[in-house]
Regions:
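Surface-exposed binding patches on compact interaction domains or structured appendages
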Residues: 5-32, 70-124
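Short, surface-exposed loop/turn segments at beta-strand-coil junctions that are enriched for proline
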Residues: 36-42, 128-130
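Short, exposed coil/turn segments at beta-strand boundaries within extracellular/luminal domains
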Residues: 41, 53-62, 143-148
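A short beta-strand micro-motif common to beta-rich folds, especially ectodomain repeats
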Residues: 43-55, 131-142
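Low-complexity, Pro/Thr/Ser/Gly/Ala-rich linker/spacer regions in secreted
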Residues: 55-73, 157-160
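A short glycine-rich, aromatic-capped structural motif
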Residues: 159-268, 296
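C-terminal, surface-exposed recognition/capping segments
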Residues: 174-176, 256-398
Length: 398
């Protein structure tokens, strides 16, 4: 705070986390704000400081200091970078454990140097120099149980934003290993499709390694087993997980967090609290500064692109679309796939775009299905409006 004064002044309203370097004086001064956490985390909160003086006719002025949590369940790291990130949740609360370790990665050499510093509430890892991909990193307690987990998303170039109708969207799906300004190349590569999320969860699932717009949909093929030959291979840490599992038990916040490689086919009502419509919920899987889009935001996007130079990339093995926007930039929309909620099997790889929204209606999710206006809020023929269905993830800026 740059205070200009020739008379006595004072600052009131300081708190234990929002202190000032000088609370009173008699001349112009630069007062520093001293912001700290409380040892439990950086929680969303605010403090109002009142600055008053003896100068006649000058009313006291108020300054509001807002502290926001920087916690996120996805950490974006550039290839070759060593990154330390706070062991905390999206609400800012620190989580405590005894060791950090990887659970699965898309490449055995993707992550190294994993370390947990309990005194600093910090996890450190190093990403390989010439690789892109994803890895799930977890903090474990003394008994080997998962306390919390984070997706470490390794990229060669940091994601940027594409603004559509006033809404800033990330230029790629969460977990995408490949992003190119050449839309045709991008949508034909399964590495651009990213990862897949059950509603209300932060733990992702891998997708397909085969794209086929003319197979693997109703009446045209037998669906392979949920995590069988059609699923992309990942590397599992055998000391931490038995690999992908299917469970008919009820999914709760505790079971989902404690079993990050288990696909649940039944969900509890409590999972509706995992994501927040229009905000960043506790299990929001987007990086810092981003959140899961609402159904209304999907509708806005679809309405805009349908009237602004939409181009359908209907060649090869996908029906993916890409859009050269009149406002500038290119929005690439892979026709991803989804994992069916009652068995985890892959449906429509390369045929239909299927993405998460944070909106629930009647207790059921409203996913975006296909790149056509109207499909984000209507229940289409093949809609899977189940909490357990896993869709792709494209984030919007908070």
């Amino acid at each position: 705070l740059n205070l200009r004064a020739s008379v006595a002044w004072k600052i009131e309203g300081a708190t234990d986390w929002c202190a000032v370097s000088q609370s009173e004086g008699t001349k112009s001064s630069v007062v520093k704000l001293l912001l700290t956490d409380d040892g439990e985390g950086v929680r969303p909160r605010s403090a109002t400081l009142t600055v008053s003086s003896e100068m006649e006719g000058v009313e006291p002025q108020q300054v509001t200091v807002v502290q926001r949590s920087t916690g996120a369940n996805t950490v974006v790291v550039r290839a070759g970078e060593t990154r330390a990130f706070p062991a905390r949740r999206t609400d800012g609360a620190y989580v405590k454990g005894v060791a950090a370790d990887w659970v699965w990665t898309t490449d055995a050499e993707l992550l190294s140097g994993l370390d947990y510093d309990a005194s600093r509430n910090e996890i450190t890892c190093t990403a390989a120099k010439s690789k892109q991909g994803s890895g799930l990193v977890a903090l474990f307690d003394a008994g080997g149980a998962v306390v919390w987990s984070w997706l470490v998303w390794v990229v060669d170039k940091m994601p940027s934003d594409v603004t559509v109708g006033g809404i800033a969207w990330q230029d790629r799906n969460v977990g995408a290993e490949y992003h190119s300004t050449d839309p045709k190349a991008c949508v034909q590569d399964f590495r651009s499709y990213g990862l897949f999320y059950q509603w209300g969860r932060k733990e992702p699932f891998i997708g397909a390694k085969i794209l086929s717009k003319n197979k693997y949909y109703e009446g045209h093929a037998e669906y392979p087993d949920a995590f069988g030959a059609m699923t992309r291979e990942v590397v599992f840490n055998a000391s931490r997980t038995a690999g992908w599992q299917i469970s008919g038990e009820e999914m709760t916040a505790a079971t989902a967090n404690g079993n990050p490689t288990t696909f649940y086919t039944r969900s509890s009502a409590a999972m509706s609290e995992g994501w927040t419509e229009g905000g960043k919920g506790l299990n929001d899987p987007c990086p810092v500064g981003y959140r899961v889009p609402t159904a209304a935001e999907w509708q806005s996007l679809l309405a805009y692109v349908d009237g602004n130079a939409a181009k359908n990339q209907d060649s090869g093995d996908t029906y993916s679309r890409w859009y050269a926007l009149n406002s500038g930039g290119t929005l690439i929309g892979p026709s991803t796939m989804f994992r069916k909620g009652d068995n985890g099997r892959i449906h429509y790889p390369g045929r239909s775009a299927a993405y998460c929204s944070s909106t629930l209606a009647g207790g059921k999710p409203l996913p975006m299905y296909d790149w056509k206006a109207g499909d984000a809020t209507g229940e289409g023929t093949y809609y899977e409006r189940k909490m357990t269905t896993a869709y792709g993830m494209r984030c919007v800026k908070e």
